[in-house]
Amino acid sequence: MKGQKLFVRPIEASDFDAVRAFAAQHGGSPDVRSGLLGKLVGELVSVLAMEVEADTVRVVDLVVAEELRRKRVGRVMLNELATLAAKLERNWLIADVKHAEFLRRVGFTEDQGVMKRRVG
């Protein structure tokens, strides 16, 4: 990944088959309808499933191809989600505490059983 730029964009209907194939290979939900995908050199390497709520954007799932884990892909995906949340005028990203250690490293804090990160 060094020297390569991760291309992140919203998931579109035309991506559903690729997202399903990615989930079959790397885990995660095969039925993501709302979220972001990350590509390196045209290859799908990450899928972030999300739900937009009243004041927040919820991270439902974040899957990175195993060979690219711990290479900042997850961090980039969450930063792009924060940018999108700000455009949607949402104040918080929230996520399950399942991956609390990683989420703390990327700016989340635990509050009342969920991980939260202020947007903006």
Language model regions located:
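Conserved beta-strand in the GNAT
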Residues: 43-51, 58-61
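Conserved GNAT acetyl-CoA-binding A-motif
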Residues: 85-98
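Conserved active-site alpha-helix within GNAT-family acetyltransferase domains
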Residues: 96-117
